[in-house]
């Protein structure tokens, strides 16, 4: 009698679980209809179900607002255990705002956030702009910088903004003004998003060590707005040739130029003329500049820039010097007019012409008889 009851129970269970007897292909199609977490959860039903989910050809995850740490652990384990011959689709949708808010709630100190260039512009939670523990903040691509009036970032000392979208013309000013210990600021503008914005108020900021890295095309509004910086890293491109007329970098002491295009040699004399207190000048060239198309007409001006005659006393550095006619004209101009210069450091890409270039440089007349020449 007991054996008969047991056999009946087994038959009932078997009839209730007929779905488990279906082939893998059908079970996979069924699991594709449910959320990925539910599909993974079927592994505890029985041995038959333990590995079915690992054969799914598509993995789609939509953030339900879970804790960010558990989300990434789940996704990592999901891919680690996945056994399908081909993964046709991997789609992960996360709520960036929730992730950032969770990070702020956990007293984040360093936050780097970059969106893919195809993503929709995304705003961040207001709590980010009142995070008291945040020391370093990097925002890149398609992030809307919408800074509330209540912004307060007392610990922030490194700020990097690359190709972000400013909500309005006051957002940048409010953000930087709220950082009482900000020592270094790297600011990049996507002109397609900011062309009509005015940055007139940015120049009123007083940073202890203003340091701006301009990492994309800029217009004259932005350059004028940062005209009180003391340290500037500046990529020079052809369209920027006219941006340096009509305003002055009154406090600029250190300038690093990264040339691109073919008109950059013409732009440098304009910058020197508008930087009266410059003490350090570096040029970092790249390999792909065509030396045959470069020009340098600005050195023919009658008046020597004040920075050359009175202030450029620390160092002149040129990495990637080629020694062509136009570059030689510029470097000869600097050597002949930098009265206070203490050190000159030159390096070249053309190792086969190193000795010739070094000989030419050493033979150039220089007004500062005490300056040393280091050739690398």
Curated annotation (Swiss-Prot):
User: Domain of life, per the record?
Assistant: Eukaryota
User: Any idea which UniProt keywords this protein has?
Assistant: Leucine-rich repeat, Repeat
Is the keyword Repeat in the record?
yes
What the entry lists under SUPFAM superfamilies is as follows: F-box domain
Organism for this UniProt entry: Arabidopsis thaliana
Where are LRR repeat segments found? 131-154, 199-224
**InterPro entries with a match to the protein in the record:** F-box-like_dom_sf, F-box_dom, FBD, FBL13/AtMIF1-like, LRR_FXL15/At3g58940/PEG3-like
Q: Name one Pfam family in it.
A: FBD
Its recorded name reads Putative F-box/FBD/LRR-repeat protein At5g52460
Domain FBD residue range list:
296-348
Q: Does the keyword Magnesium apply?
A: no
Annotated PROSITE patterns? FBOX (PS50181)
List the transmembrane segments.
none
Q: Where is the F-box domain?
A: 16-75
């Amino acid at each position: 009698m007991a054996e008969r009851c047991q056999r009946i129970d087994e038959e009932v269970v078997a009839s209730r679980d007929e779905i488990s007897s279906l082939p893998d292909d059908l079970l996979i199609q069924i699991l594709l209809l449910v959320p990925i977490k539910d599909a993974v959860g079927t592994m505890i039903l029985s041995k038959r179900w333990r590995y079915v989910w690992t054969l799914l050809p598509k993995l789609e995850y939509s953030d339900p607002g879970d804790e960010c740490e558990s989300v990434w652990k789940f996704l990592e384990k999901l891919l680690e255990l996945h056994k399908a011959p081909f993964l046709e689709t991997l789609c992960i949708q996360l709520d960036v705002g929730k992730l950032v808010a969770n990070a702020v709630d956990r007293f984040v100190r360093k936050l780097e956030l970059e969106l893919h260039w195809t993503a929709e512009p995304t705003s961040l939670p207001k709590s980010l702009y009142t995070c008291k523990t945040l020391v370093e903040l990097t925002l890149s691509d398609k992030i809307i910088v919408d800074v509330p009036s209540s912004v307060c970032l007392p610990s922030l000392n490194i700020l990097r903004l690359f190709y972000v979208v400013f909500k309005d013309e006051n957002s940048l000013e409010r953000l930087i003004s709220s950082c009482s210990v900000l020592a270094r600021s790297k600011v990049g503008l996507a002109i397609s998003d900011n062309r009509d914005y005015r940055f007139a108020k940015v120049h009123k900021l007083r940073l202890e060590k203003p340091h701006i890295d301009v990492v994309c095309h800029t217009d004259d509004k932005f350059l004028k707005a940062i005209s009180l910086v003391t340290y500037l890293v500046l990529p020079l491109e052809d369209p920027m040739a006219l941006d340096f007329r009509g305003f002055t970098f009154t406090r600029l002491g250190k300038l690093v130029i990264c040339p691109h295009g073919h008109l950059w040699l013409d732009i440098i004399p304009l910058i020197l003329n508008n930087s009266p207190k410059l003490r350090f000048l570096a040029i970092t060239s790249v390999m792909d500049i065509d030396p045959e198309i470069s020009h340098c007409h600005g050195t023919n001006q009658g008046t020597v820039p004040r920075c050359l005659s009175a202030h450029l006393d620390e160092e002149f550095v040129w990495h990637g010097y080629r020694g062509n006619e136009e570059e030689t004209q510029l470097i000869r101009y600097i050597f002949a007019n930098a009265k206070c210069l203490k050190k000159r450091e030159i390096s070249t890409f053309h190792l086969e012409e190193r000795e010739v270039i070094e000989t030419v440089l050493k033979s150039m007349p220089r007004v500062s008889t005490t300056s040393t020449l280091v050739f690398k």
